[in-house]
Structure formats: C-alpha cells, structure tokens
C-alpha cells in the first residue's frame, strides 16, 4: 500500500486508521474514520473512557500480529456528538520494506445482532456434561454474564468466588459493571465484545474485590450458548504483579536511577515533534541547562558518596522550584535540564535566578555550600531541539567562564 492509494479507502463504509507503530502516529484515516474522530487525536481514541486494549504501546503488538493472532481494540469514538465504543481489528501491513504499519479496521455490529432478552433469569447450572466439568473444575476465575440483562452475572465458578471474595449467591446478584472500575462505562464495551466471535487477544481492565481492593485483570470474553441461553463467558486472569513489574521497568527506562528525575532519553522522546504538539508546547517554551559548579572538586575532595548527595539535593531543589507543568531532567553527570512550557524568556530567566539563589542556600552535612551556573534559551521560530540546545549550552558555557554561580541568556 502506497501513499497515493490511501484515498481509495474513502470508498469503504467501515472506518479505517493506518498507524505507524513505532512513532504511534496516525498516517491516514479514511472518511468514515474521520467522521468518528471529530476533533480527537488517534491517541485520544485509544485512551478515551470506553477504550480497552491488550497493550498500551503499539510496538508490543508486532510479534503477535506477525504471527497472525487475532487482536481487537475498543476505541472511544464520536457518534451524534456522543462518545461511544467501537471495536477494531488490528492487521499488520508493510508500507515499505522497512516501515510496517498497523491498520485499525472498525467492526460495525450487524443490526441483526442486537441484544435480545434471554432466559438467563431462569438459568440453572447443570452438574453433568462437559461444560459443567470445564466450568466447575477450572483453576481460572470464570463468570457467565448476560449482556441483555444489564451485565447480570448469572454464574461464577469456585475460582472466581475465591478471587472476588463473594459467596455464590452474592456474586450472582451483581452486575459486571459493579466489579469493573469503569462502572457503567463498561456496558458499551460489553455490547461491543458480545458481537465479536471470540478467539481474540484478551483485554485489560481493573476489577474491584469484595474487600474494596483492586486488581489488574486480563479478560478473555466471548459469546457462548448454554442450555439455550445466549451469554458471555468471561475468563479472568490476575495480572497485577505483571503490571507492577511492567510499571517498574517503564519507570526505570524513563527515569534516572539515582535522582528519580526524568532522564535524557525521555527528554528526546518528549521533544519529538509529535509529542510536543500533543503537549501543546510546540513553539512557546524555554529551556534551562543547569551545571553544578566545581563538581569534580567536590568528588575529589569529599568522595563520590558526597557528590551523589549534592546531585540528589540539587534534584529536590529543582523540583521544589519548578512550577506545575515544568519538566525536570537529569541530563548526565552534574548537568540538569528544565523544560518550561508556555514560558517566555523573561519568565525563564526569573525562574533560573530563583533556582540559583535556592541552591546556594542548600546545606549538606560535611560539605561547604555549592552553587550552579545556568544557561537559558527560548525556542525561536522553527529551530530544532538540537539547535535550541546548542544555544542554551553556549549560554551555560559563558556563565561558567564568567565566574560561575550566575544565570545567562542565549
């Protein structure tokens, strides 16, 4: 598929989005998709109130898509000025030999599949047969849900009762929206899932237990007909520990281990053009580059552990001086960066002076006072982040050469 053929997708009545997985940027949306987006970005479609997915980051889908696994995401779209849910099937295609794209194709539920009242109010679990043995003895929590009765839970196996902490009678008096942290917002999502054939990758939710605690869960849900009742079978897997480890790894990838500040890698990620637009700071922002004066002397004379104390104390001082929305990074060694959204040069200079004065007051046991030099620059026109950084680095160099413990503008 090449660029000049994208317009042919406008002939389709189903919505189609073509997305670059690595930049997570929308390449093309056909007319049906644009109608559902209104003023929303594709990122907002994936993170809206009705949005559910297996993975937050699109590159994590690539292996499964290459192996032709069935992957579904539910997006939050606009219909008649109201937000609602839309199921999409994901497919991997090669735009070029080196550039794969993920195609999100909307799955519109046929009108004949509207939810109809079932007989599940009279549902009685039978103790014999394959289904009963499978349901009762399975070690995974399982729920039978009736979407047509407001998400009523009509049966739960022993593993589910143990997981949620309810007895069978209480569990079967509940609706799925009562155990899902989305509350009633889960109903349009359930409506979408009830139309899918099953077999797709699981979706992630947060469920609430009887004791009030919450757990991250992965749910395999699909339609099933049992004893003449058209229900949904939901298999629940607790992924709380997995999520905790993922969050720890993600934090480690984006943050400096010693100071806890954002790291240089995250700075470059945030200042990518697409990210800057998302943060609404593409033009009007300033940059501070802060260097600890005579830091090598501190390390040589007092030891590296004291040097680490200086860096951590400086990090906390920068955080305390930063305003809401400012971003603080450890650049490397004894250098730090502040990204100041919607900040003109004079305001940035004033903040830099506040930082300089505050740092000079920091007291660390066993050490003399230390100071910082700060370069300041405001983004100009269409200059790149590298061009801006060179200007602020030059300003810092002049501040160091002019005697240190001072603030200079580019």
UniProtKB/Swiss-Prot annotation:
- Top EC class for this record: transferase
Q: Could you tell me which SUPFAM superfamilies the record lists for this protein? A: Nucleotide cyclase, PYP-like sensor domain (PAS domain)
Q: Where is this site: Transition state stabilizer?
A: 296
Q: Which residues bind Mg(2+)?
A: 291, 334
Residue intervals of the GGDEF domain = 283-410
InterPro entries reported for this sequence: Diguanylate_Cyclase, GGDEF_dom, Nucleotide_cyclase, PAS, PAS-assoc_C, PAS-like_dom_sf, PAS_4, Rev_trsase/Diguanyl_cyclase
**Domain PAS, chain residue ranges per copy:** 3-70, 129-198
Tell me which EC number(s) this protein carries: 2.7.7.65
Where on this chain does substrate bind? 299, 304, 308
Q: Which GO terms of the cellular component aspect does the record hold? A: plasma membrane
* Reactions that this protein is recorded to catalyse: 2 GTP = 3',3'-c-di-GMP + 2 diphosphate
Which biological pathway?
A: Purine metabolism; 3',5'-cyclic di-GMP biosynthesis
Enzyme active site: 334 (proton acceptor)
Cofactor(s) annotated in UniProt: Mg(2+)
Residue intervals of the PAC domain: 199-251
* Cofactor stoichiometry and binding remark: Binds 1 Mg(2+) ion per monomer.
Q: Name one GO biological process term.
A: negative regulation of bacterial-type flagellum-dependent cell motility
Q: Which UniProt keywords apply?
A: GTP-binding, Magnesium, Metal-binding, Nucleotide-binding, Repeat, Transferase
Q: Which CDD domains match?
A: GGDEF, PAS
* Gene Ontology molecular function: diguanylate cyclase activity; GTP binding; metal ion binding
Reported function: Part of a signaling cascade that regulates curli biosynthesis. The cascade is composed of two cyclic-di-GMP (c-di-GMP) control modules, in which c-di-GMP controlled by the DgcE/PdeH pair (module I) regulates the activity of the DgcM/PdeR pair (module II), which in turn regulates activity of the transcription factor MlrA and expression of the master biofilm regulator csgD.
- Name it: Diguanylate cyclase DgcM
Biological source species:
Escherichia coli O157:H7
Q: What is the lineage of its organism?
A: Bacteria, Pseudomonadati, Pseudomonadota, Gammaproteobacteria, Enterobacterales
């Amino acid at each position: 598929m090449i660029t000049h053929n994208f317009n042919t997708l406008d002939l389709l009545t189903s919505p189609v989005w073509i997305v670059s997985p690595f930049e997570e940027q929308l390449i093309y949306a056909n007319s049906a998709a644009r109608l559902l987006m209104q003023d929303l970005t594709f990122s907002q479609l994936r993170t809206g109130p009705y949005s559910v997915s297996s993975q937050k980051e699109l590159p994590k889908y690539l292996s499964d898509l290459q192996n032709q696994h069935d992957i579904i995401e539910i997006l939050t779209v606009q219909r008649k000025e109201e937000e609602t849910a839309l199921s999409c099937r994901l497919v991997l295609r090669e735009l070029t030999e080196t550039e794969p794209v993920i195609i999100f194709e909307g799955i519109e539920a046929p009108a004949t599949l509207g939810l109809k009242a079932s007989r599940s109010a009279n549902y009685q679990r039978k103790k014999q047969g394959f289904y009963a043995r499978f349901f009762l003895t399975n070690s995974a929590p399982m729920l039978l849900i009736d979407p047509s009765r407001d998400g009523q839970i009509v049966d739960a196996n022993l593993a589910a009762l143990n997981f949620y902490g309810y007895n069978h009678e209480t569990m079967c008096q509940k609706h799925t929206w009562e155990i899902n942290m989305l509350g009633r917002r889960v109903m349009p999502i359930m409506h979408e899932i009830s139309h899918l054939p099953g077999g797709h990758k699981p979706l992630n939710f947060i469920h609430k237990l009887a004791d009030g605690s919450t757990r991250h869960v992965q749910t395999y849900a699909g339609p099933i007909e049992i004893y003449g009742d058209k229900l949904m079978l939901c298999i629940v897997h607790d992924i709380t520990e997995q999520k905790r480890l993922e969050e720890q790894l993600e934090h480690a990838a984006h943050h400096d281990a010693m100071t806890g500040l954002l790291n240089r890698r995250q700075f470059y990620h945030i200042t990518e053009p697409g990210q800057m637009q998302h943060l609404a700071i593409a033009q009007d922002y300033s940059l501070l580059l802060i260097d600890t004066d005579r830091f090598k002397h501190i390390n040589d004379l007092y030891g590296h552990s004291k040097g680490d104390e200086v860096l951590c104390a400086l990090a906390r001082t920068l955080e305390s001086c930063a305003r809401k929305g400012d971003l603080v990074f450890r650049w490397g060694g004894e250098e730090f960066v502040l990204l100041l959204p919607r900040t003109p040069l004079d305001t940035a200079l004033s903040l830099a002076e506040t930082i300089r004065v505050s740092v000079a007051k920091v007291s660390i046991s066993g050490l003399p006072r230390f100071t910082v030099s700060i370069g300041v620059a405001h983004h100009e026109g269409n200059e790149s982040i590298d061009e801006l950084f060179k200007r602020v680095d030059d300003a810092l160099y002049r501040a160091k050469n002019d005697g240190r413990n001072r603030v200079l503008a580019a």
